[in-house]
Amino acid sequence: MMAAAPIQQNGTHTGVPIDLDPPDSRKRPLEAPPEAGSTKRTNTGEDGQYFLKVLIPSYAAGSIIGKGGQTIVQLQKETGATIKLSKSKDFYPGTTERVCLIQGTVEALNAVHGFIAEKIREMPQNVAKTEPVSILQPQTTVNPDRIKQTLPSSPTTTKSSPSDPMTTSRANQVKIIVPNSTAGLIIGKGGATVKAVMEQSGAWVQLSQKPDGINLQERVVTVSGEPEQNRKAVELIIQKIQEDPQSGSCLNISYANVTGPVANSNPTGSPYANTAEVLPTAAAAAGLLGHANLAGVAAFPAVLSGFTGNDLVAITSALNTLASYGYNLNTLGLGLSQAAATGALAAAAASANPAAAAANLLATYASEASASGSTAGGTAGTFALGSLAAATAATNGYFGAASPLAASAILGTEKSTDGSKDVVEIAVPENLVGAILGKGGKTLVEYQELTGARIQISKKGEFVPGTRNRKVTITGTPAATQAAQYLITQRITYEQGVRAANPQKVG
C-alpha cells in the first residue's frame, strides 16, 4: 500500500521539503489537530485507493465528459480511476460549479486532475472567469484561517504569480474539498505545512475560513498559480490526503440534501457558503426576525429600475421570501403594479438563496430608512414589527424609548481605511441578551451564517460603564454589519413585544 511520510515537528517547518516518495510507515503526523486523532482508516481500500474531491466550473464539464460520456470513460480506462460527477445544475452551494469525486491510486488522482485542469484552462478567457459575487451577498475580509500567509519569496514565485484567489482567473485556480481533519494536516502547526507547500510549489494556497463555535465537516482549498505551480501544489495536497485516515469520510457529490452549514468555496468572506441549506426555508428566516409583518413601515426608497440581471433576480427573490411569510409588499412603497409584482415573484422562484436575499433587502431598507432620517424622531413605526408596534411602545417605561433601536443603542462605528470593513458596537440590556444568543447560542450562529458578519457579545458581568448593558460588537463589510444589526434590532423588538404581552416573563 502506498503511504507518505509525515513532516516531523522540529520547530523549523518553513522550507522543509515534503517527501513525495513512499516510506515504510503510516505514522500519524504530529501536526494533526485533535479532531484528526482517530486512527480508523477509512480513506483507502485494499488496493491503495484514495479519494480526491474537486470543483469543476459548469462551462468546462462538457469537455471533460465528452460526447455521450466517451471522454470520461476513456479517462477512467487509461488511469484506472473511478470518476463521479454531480448532475447538471446540481452545483456546489453558492457556486455554479459541479462536484467531481475521483477514486484511485495516487498516480491516478494526479493524472485525472491534470487532465481536468487542462480542460478548464482550454476554455476561452471570456468564459473561464472568476465567479461574480452578488452585491447583495455580504462578505467579510478575514485573513484565511487567521494564518498570516505571505507569498513566499522563492525562485519559482514572481510578481506575476497570482496573489489573490478572488481576482485570479478561474482557469488558474484549483478548488479541492477536503474533510476538516485533512484541512488540519494541510495547514500544519502554526501554518508551517501550508507555507512549505507554497514555497515548494510557488502556488498560492488558501483554505476557507474556520468558523468559531461550530465545526464544518469540510473545507475548501483554493490553489492559485501557473499550471506547473498548481500541479506541484496538488501533488503535495494529495500527499496530505494520503496521510489522513479520515480523508475518505465525506464522499458525497451532491449537496442538495445536506443539512447544516457548508464551507464557502472562496477563501475569504464568511466560513459558510451562500446556500439555502444553511437556512433552508423562508420560515427559518422568519423565525430569526420574529412573527410579524411590515404593516405601517415607511416607504421603501429603493428604485428597482437601477438594477438588472442577477441583482434584480436577487431582489425579487427577497420580495418573494418576504411575501411568503406574511409581509405586505404593497406597504413597502416599491411602486410595483399588480402585474409587475406578480412577475417579480415568479422570477424569484429561480433564486438559490431567497432567505439571505431577504435579510439583505431588509438591511438595505434599514440603511436607507436611517439615511433618510426616518429614525430621527424615534417613532415606533419606523422599525416596528406591525402588530407589535403597540406592544413595543408599551415597554417604553422599561427601556426608556419608543424605538427598538433604543434597546440596542449604538456605542460607536469604525471603518477600515479602505472602507471595506465596519466595526459596529451596540449596547443591549442584560435581560435581552438571551434573545440574541438563543438556545445554546443557536440564534447567534444563525445570524452570523445568514449575514456573513462576526458577532461577539461581552462576557456575563462585563457591562458598558455605568449601565447594566452588555456590549455587542459586529464586524464585517458594511452590508454584513448592517444586516446583522438589523436582525438583532428586530429580534429585540420582537422580544420586547412578547414580554409586554406577557409581563410575567420580564426579568
UniProtKB/Swiss-Prot annotation:
Q: Which PROSITE patterns match?
A: KH_TYPE_1 (PS50084)
Residue ranges for motif Bipartite nuclear localization signal? 27-43
Q: Which GO terms describe its molecular function?
A: mRNA 3'-UTR binding; mRNA binding; RNA binding; sequence-specific mRNA binding
Which superkingdom, per the lineage? Eukaryota
UniProt region (Required for RNA binding), positions on chain: 419-503
At which residues is Phosphoserine found? 154
**Cellular localization per UniProt:** Nucleus
Per its UniProt record, what InterPro entries does this chain match?
A: KH-I_NOVA_rpt1 (IPR047275), KH-I_NOVA_rpt2 (IPR047276), KH-I_NOVA_rpt3 (IPR047274), KH_dom (IPR004087), KH_dom_type_1 (IPR004088), KH_dom_type_1_sf (IPR036612)
Q: Does the keyword tRNA processing apply?
A: no
Tell me the domain comment.
Answer: The KH domain consists of approximately 70 amino acids and includes a conserved hydrophobic core, an invariant Gly-X-X-Gly motif, and an additional variable segment. The third KH domain (KH3) binds a hairpin RNA loop containing the 5'-UCAY-3' motif on targeted molecules. RNA binding by KH3 requires residues C-terminal to the KH domain.
General remark: Target antigen in a human paraneoplastic motor disorder, paraneoplastic opsoclonus-myoclonus ataxia (POMA). POMA antibodies block NOVAl RNA binding.
Q: What is this protein called?
A: RNA-binding protein Nova-1
**Organism annotation:** Homo sapiens (Human)
Write the lineage as a comma-separated list.
Eukaryota, Metazoa, Chordata, Craniata, Vertebrata
